[in-house]
Amino acid sequence: MTQLRFVGVGGQGVILAGEILSAAKIADGGYGIKASTYTSQVRGGPTKVDILLSDDEVLYPYANEGEIDFMLATAQKSYDAFKDGVKEGGIIVVEPNLVKPIEEDKKRWKIYNIPIISIAKDEVGNVITQSVVALGVAMEFTHVMDMEKVRQRMLDSVPDKVKAANEKAYELGIKYAKEARG
């Protein structure tokens, strides 16, 4: 089983990214579970979505703290609150304009800086696509399932008028993740 965690603040689309990933895994014949945690604030409150993906049945619907393989963070307060769930040596991708890991964190985890929000805003031209940029990043780092099936599930989840922008966002997420890994 692969355990992923996306964290940010309300309004950044982290829950949507989790829904797309878990739905894509189910459509692919596997098991996908999404468990979200967020405050009552509509925008701005800490948000977390844990995604469990497996080819075998998942018997417990929550991520195991300290065993998460991959985390993506777009807000400092959420990063600080939820980072300890990532296993030693696990991968954490941060939005460097908003999240600043301390030196100790860089020793515990493999941390990559990818400007997800800037990519969505400046290269896609629509900041709302940041969750899809994040989706592409997560897929490139984890390879948890067929990337084309995730792309298709994502395109099925967005309105027609924004399909092209979201497809570009997904591709840019993959591209930047490849570059970050070297």
State each model region's role.
Residues 1-182:
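Active-site cofactor/cluster-binding pocket
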